[in-house]
Structures are given as C-alpha cells and as structure tokens.
C-alpha cells in the first residue's frame, strides 16, 4: 500500500486510449447487471466478477474454489480470481466504442478547448459532432478549404462534382482527424508572431488559443485524446446495486447511464456488421455520442436524461460537484468513528479543564481501551470475552473505565464551528444521566447555552493525538481569543451578577466602621450577622500578606468592604489588592487614599467618603487579562474557577428577583410625549403649507420621536435606585441594557416595517402598561424581521467564512525571517475626526521594522526587529510619536506563507508565533466568526443618495469580493487643487487642476461633496461621499494604497459594531487578494501575455531572463475577490473542491497540472498529514523532543519510550 505521507505531488492529465485499457481488467460487453433469480452478477455485464473480482472474499463465481488457501487462483470454470472482495472497489473495466465520441468537458466547457485548438466556433463543432454537417478534412485538389462546413445538400453536390478527390467527414471521427493533423510547434510559433501585431478581439482570442496550445505542447497530452475510443467503467462498488426489503433493487444512476451507452454501442456494432445504410449508422452514432455525454455530464447539453419521476440522473460530473459531491461530502467532511453526541447541561462544579461524560457514552467510546485493560488485568481471558463483558455491563467494567479515562482527554465540538475555539479538549469525569456536562466559562467560546444545545464528543486515539489535545487544545490553555488577544473566558450572567453584588458598597450598612484584625475575623462577623457584605470596614493591612503593599502601608489600616475582602481572596498573592475598578488599581497598586493611620476615627472617615463603584463585567475581563499577563495559563485558569464559584455562590445568596414593582413608572412621561406630539403637529403644518418636502417631514418626525425616547430613557435611568434588581442586572453587564429597560418602563419607541423602513407612528406604551392592539401589531413586524434576518445572516456569514478559509488556507508561518527590505507605516486609523483604531492597538504584538527613538531624548524605545510589548507601545504613544514603521504580512517576502517576524505575536497565546502555525485559517476564522454579529441591512435614510452606504455584513462581502461598491465615490487621479464646480446639462463636474494637466470629474446632482473650491487633493482622494472602488484605487495609488484602504474599511465596519479584530488577520486576507500579477508583455520570457502569475513565479521568470541579459516581462498587479482568488490558486485540488469543479478539472487536465500539496485542503483530500503545526516536515520525525548526544542514546533507551 502506498504511504500517503511520502507523496511529493499529484498530477492530473488526459488519459490516452492505451492508458484506459491498461487500467482495465476486462471489457464490459453486456448491459446486464445481476441475474434476478440467482442475484449473482451476469458474465461480461456491469457487475461481472471475472472483470471486477469476486463478490465474497476468497470465493469464485461458480463456487469451485472457496477459502483463503486458494488465494490468487483463477478458476478454470468461471474465470474469476480468488481474492478479497474489496478489489471490487478498485478494479476498473472498459467499453470498446464502435465509433469515436467527443468528451463533453473539452467540447462544451467555456471556453471550448476543442474549439480553441481547431480555431472553430463551438457552434460549428456541435454541428459536426452531432452529425448535422460535414467538415472538410482534406480538400485535395478542390477549391474547398480545410475545416469548411458543408450541409448534406452541399456535400452531395460537391461529391457529384469532384468525386473522391476530397474528403469530408462527420462526427467525432472527423474532429479527431483534424486534431491529429495539427502541428503544435508550428501553431504556437504562428500565434506568438500574431500576438506581436494583433489588437482587440483578435489579440484576446490569440492569447486564449496560445494558452491551450502551450498547455498541450508542455504537458505531453495529445489533443486527439479529447476524443474517446475507449470508455473506462468505474469499479462496481462505487456504483452499487443493493436489494431493498421488498425485493426491489436500488441502484446508482451511473448504472443506468452505462447501460444506455452499452446498448447503443452494441446496436451500432451490429448495424456496422450488417452494413446498414449510412443514415441509420449516423443516427446510431449520434445517439451513442449523446449517451456518453449524459454519462460524463448529464444536462450539460440539451435536456438531461431522466429516471423515474422525471428526476435527472446523476452523472460522473455530479458525483464530484457541490456540497454532496465526492470532494466536500467524503474527502473534506468525513464522518469519524469513536464519536458521540448528546445534549449539554451546565456543570458548575467542574474545573476549567474538565467535562462530564455520561457513563454509558464513555463505555462505548472507550470500548477498545477497556477491552485491552480487562485482558491485561486478567479479568477476561481474551478480547472476545472482554467484549462480551462490556456488552453485558459487568460491574468490573466500571472500575476499569474509571482508570482508562484518567489522563485521556476528549474533544468537545459544538456546531457550527465558527473558529478554532469551537473544538476544545477536556479531561472527562464520569457523570450519571445521559447529558454531557459543560464548564460554564467555556460557553462564550462555543457560543453555547443550555436550552437544548447538543455537542459532539471525539476521542483522540494515538499518543501524538492525545499529546496535542492535552498541550494545545485543553480548554484551560485557550483563554485568549485568537481574533483580538482578549480573554474569551470572561464570566457572564449569574457569575457577573454574583461578583457585582459581592463588591457593592452601601451607606449605613450594619456594622459600618468596624475594625477587623484580618479577613477571617471579618468573615466571622459577616456569618454571625454583625456585618454585611456591603459594609464598609477597616482591616489591618499587614494581615492581608499582599506583596504589593509597602512597608508603610502595611502599618496602616485598609478601608474596604467585607465583600471585597472575600473577592480578593481569589487573586494571587503578588497581585494588587483590588479596591476600586480602575486601571491604576489593577496594573500598579492599591490607591494610597484607602490607607489610614491607626487611631483615625474609622466611622467618620468612611462616612465622609463617596461610595466606590462595584466591579462590572468589563472590569472582571480586565482582571483576567492582567492575571494572564503576569502569571500565564495555569494560575489564570485556577483563578477563573475561583471567580466562577464565587459568582455562583453570591448570586445565590443575593437572591436577585424581578417583580412587577421593580419596574418604576415615570411620572413625567406623558408630558414628554405631549410635547413631542405638539412638535410633530407643527412639522405636519409646515408640510401642508408646502414649506418642507415629504422626505424632510418624514425625517423630522422620526427625529422628534427618537429624541423623546432618549429623554425618557435618560430620566428613567436617573430615577432608578442603584439597589433595583433590574438596574443591577443591567449595570453589572449580566443581562439587559438601558434600551430593554426603557421598553419595560418607558416607551417602546419607533419600529421598522418589513422593508426595514421606520414606521413614523411610535409605540408610546411600555410593556409595564401594556400595548394597544394597533401597537402590538406594529411591533410584530420588527420581531419577525429580526428572526428572518438572523437566519439569513447565519447562512451568509457561514459562506463568507468558507470563502475566506479557502483563499487563505495555505498561508502558514514557513520561516523565521524573510529578510524583507520594506515595512508598513502605521498610524491611528481615523475617519474624519473619529478614531476607528488607536495607534497603540496597531503596535502591540508587532515587530518593529527599524529602531523607534524617543523624539525628545533620542533614546531607543524599541530595537529593530523587536516585538513591541504593551509597555513599549504605551511609551511610544506617550512620547508623542504619530507613526511607526512595522513589519507586516503586506510586505513579507516568504513564498506560500508569511514569516515569523512579519506576523508578530500569536494573539491566541500572547507569545511569538511559531513556525508551522496556520495563520491563514486563523485569520479567516477571526474575520468570519464575528460575521453573525454584524447587521444585515443597508441603512436607508429617506433616500439621500450619499447616505445609502452599505454597512455590516454586505459591506464586508463587498470589500473581500472586490466588487464595485454601492454608492461609489468619485476619486481624483492626480494631485492638485479643486478649481471649480461646473454645471453641465443634467449633472455637475468637479475640476481638479494638477501641476501639468487639468481633469474634470462628472458627479451626480444628489451626491454630497467632500471637498470645497481651493482644497488641495492627493491622487486617490475622495471628492464625494461614498465608498471607493478598490480596483480603481489600485490603478491610481498602487498596491500599498489599496492595502491601506481595505484594511481601514474592514476595521471600520467591525469597530462600528463593537467587534475588535487584530490588523494582522485582515492583512493576511488582503495579501491573498493581491498575490497575482497580470502579464502585459512577455519580453524574452516563456510566460504568456494576459496570463495570471503568482508574484514569485513572475519574479523568478524575469530573474532567469535578466541573468541571460534578455528583456524581462512586464505585468501589473491585480486585485482578485476572494472567490476568484480561491479558484486561481495553483492547487487544482483545492480549487476543484471549492467551486466550479468541472471547469477547474478540465483546465488542470489539459495543462497536465501538478499539485505540489502546499496548502491544508489538498493534503486533507489525499489523506496526508497537513503541512502545518506538528505536520511540518521539519517536525515530522521528532520522536521525543529531546536532543540527546549520541553516546547517551543506548543508555537511555527505556526513558525515550516513556516520553
């Protein structure tokens, strides 16, 4: 058996008739499948055992030879070889066709490859192949031209005139003759000559023809192989026929299609033997051609062949195409053994790295391990009895199971797996019941809740797989989110509420101003009712053993609350005592003002102070990030578990409830509504008098009601007591926000109709008061639209992720430094006056391109090629530096990937990225995963042209697909000043005066100007509001201008929705869109003008020519959308499994393409280890990870085996 890991590349080509015969084990001569009485395959039929091998292991057709001892014997009676039945999956047969037929992929594809080779139109080809016209194959001495089409009538008249002096034929035979006559060398030279002078359409056609001719010349494929003499028959197990319960048979559609071909072929043979009239033979040949077309690609030409119930039959091409095709269903989406799924329930008692596995599920999943252990413990004699024991659930089994699952991690996956945190590893603990228990903190990463979600469990079997699961995938390791490097395991809901309640302060609580010698004493006071959690007290600072306190502070008293004393117990010793939710307290030390000298009157001191705010969700996240930064993984996951327990415990003790009395009704509400109504009436009056337009009236009414709702909201929030449970839930970040509360207690406000337009009648009631029928009806629109949008958005976002993954899947960190001589200048991303992304966010975790010096002192803050840390980034920003040059994926020189230095820090681990990290996939997931959070709609604001800019998910798709944007902005191509605005006919023009020339740009009337007369503008700058067309920008500002623009725009959309994504992810994607060059002229190189080349291929071709002092090729960069870029990848396996399968394969076969298996998808398809992570060649043969001196090797044999 071939070892999959030793493949170098995979090549595809056209099969010659000899090749097809060499694959075959025999000719299929009859259309029969199996005998209906004996249910055995018919001889020479589509399932023949003599050709394809026996149906039962080691047993021939007639039963003369049975058992394995006759292995390899060919039965003298029935001719079947005695071997395993699985050869029926690999042995092929063939059909000798009585007349040549054309292969529909090469004749019918776009562009028609046969047409390009012969320089004929597809229409003419079709007429010849389907016997509607004759084609002159040899004009002889007649005035006819080669390849001239003749109708039946013309052929007759010429035949009468010239007799046998010329040859004209019909059908695929004629085409084959023409293909064989072609001299490729001569044609290629002629085409290259023609290219030098040709223009327009002729040039395009010549380029296309040259490409196909070159392909045939270089690949070793013969052009005549596009015509088939022999048809391969695929193995029978791949087109099976199975008996159903009622004695009927279910068969693959391919068998029907093959039967049609064989029937027509046999009939044609008979007609030829009988010497039938040519018209009958021609008709039969045409029918054979159509049958073969239907077999290869049913429905490509004419009406598809249908089966019972008018269903089109699935041909060979359909077996590969689409989601149900071979690629996506079986090669990229295999189902795996050792897996199970069940409903999840919360497991608050679990540790971060644990999950609860139901006993009966564990028993089934770990069956082989249990059997082995039962035998090795002597509890069963052999594997068979061990298996029986497990099936009967013998009590011994449970003890063994407990031991087997120790230290054996399992993987939990929740669909949809939107990013890599959708599969994590846990150590299983056995639980009763049939539900999987999940740790509450990992829910955010999985986006799971416990309303009936299900999860799948997978068992890593091999030692390497277990090691990877434990070291890389354990839930306790995945604390940071790969998209922005922020903690993903922040507490939510109950846990937030508990910790918020715990850290609240209250005036005049029981025992206020008490003084305790240590935490324990305070706890006893709380438990015995002498103090409350919210009581402000003093405690001896030295008793807290906090390593951040100074000597002086330790001698003082610390003012805090009982709750905060309890909260700080969960934090590590050398962490500041957290007394207030500020960055200063978190990052540096407990503020000095909380320490008082002994002897101060504590009660008076406390009463003179303001209450300190409690710790909300965001601050808890900051604490986690800070602990992670200082103490790394292990300590953080322990602290998280303690924080979770604390939260659950105190949210229970808090006993938060929501009652109707908690929803306070605003007294001034009616007044505010009346005032708004008056304003609306006034606007209506103005409209009726014709002072304002319909649009203005609508916009103003909407604005009035929105403002009224905001006023009510502000007053409501102001009137709420901060002890109100609903307020506490919303304020802490546990659930709900101000808008939800306004709907409960104030008013619901304005609603959108099904088209997304805002209805101008507001809902004045709140849920507390109850809605009128009319109001209820209006609000159903919005609710329904919400659900519909969510469903559509999920599908759209999923498809976006799929395309992103496809285009970036081969971007892997391949080396540590590419040695590039270019950097990327970064500054804060700004849109007008608003900052989209501050400079500090763009610097952290990036490598500097040159020394960064302090502008005043001149000292070096960051060395060249050094990773910029948080502190260094802070120093850079504080020193007033506005822009820094960093290494970036945009400027990286690594082939097929990025280098360590240009990528910088791996956001998911907080340390340098390692060689082998699949950063392309991480980037795609980081951009795709928040896609569901983006809005769907294009905002319509009453038809003002400039405002209808696409936002949210559609805008992201527009950017990554490099489409012409909606609401396109007009941009200037030259530097200069805005001279004037001219009015021409029905539009206006902006005139820009450059140094040398003057340009004018036509602008629609309703566009909104971004510049005024006298402004200085740069090339590529927008003159009107709207989105820039990136392709236009590429021509004006070049690659760097487009890269900057796309990065800024993608970040703008995400940041507007409050989603943070690391720049480097967007850079990786944009790099993939700009990796091709379109050749303009080929110079002395071999490359074809008009062809698309990878950047490095183009450079290599030029380098070669320059070394020989020839003329290099010229090219211009192109921006491809992600779908186009995926299909243009060098790997035909990856492209074929993405979209347009048949087109990609047709093209690859003609070119005889080699797939070098550099990306991840291609390797998954052929079943090889992916070339990323531990699958990279340089890591492949590391046994133990220990580099031992040679002398030590013998002595430590035992140790290596345990590693």
From Swiss-Prot:
One of its GO terms (biological process) is DNA-templated transcription. Its cofactor is Mg(2+); Zn(2+). It holds the Pfam family RNA_pol_Rpb1_2. Binds 1 Mg(2+) ion per subunit. Binds 2 Zn(2+) ions per subunit. Zn(2+) 1 binds at residues 60, 62, 75, 78. It catalyses: RNA(n) + a ribonucleoside 5'-triphosphate = RNA(n+1) + diphosphate. Zn(2+) 2 binds at residues 818, 892, 899, 902. It comes from the Bacteria. The keyword Nucleotidyltransferase applies. Residues 1190-1203 have a biased composition (Acidic residues). Residues 1180-1203 are annotated as: Disordered. GO terms for cellular component: DNA-directed RNA polymerase complex. Coiled coil: none annotated. SUPFAM superfamilies: beta and beta-prime subunits of DNA dependent RNA-polymerase. GO terms for molecular function: DNA binding; DNA-directed RNA polymerase activity; magnesium ion binding; zinc ion binding. The keyword Disulfide bond does not apply. Keywords: DNA-directed RNA polymerase, Magnesium, Metal-binding, Nucleotidyltransferase, Transcription, Transferase, Zinc. Belongs to the RNA polymerase beta' chain family. DNA-dependent RNA polymerase catalyzes the transcription of DNA into RNA using the four ribonucleoside triphosphates as substrates. HAMAP family: RNApol_bact_RpoC. PANTHER family: DNA-DIRECTED RNA POLYMERASE, DNA-DIRECTED RNA POLYMERASE SUBUNIT BETA. This is DNA-directed RNA polymerase subunit beta'. It comes from Oceanobacillus iheyensis (strain DSM 14371 / CIP 107618 / JCM 11309 / KCTC 3954 / HTE831). The lineage of its organism: Bacteria, Bacillati, Bacillota, Bacilli, Bacillales.
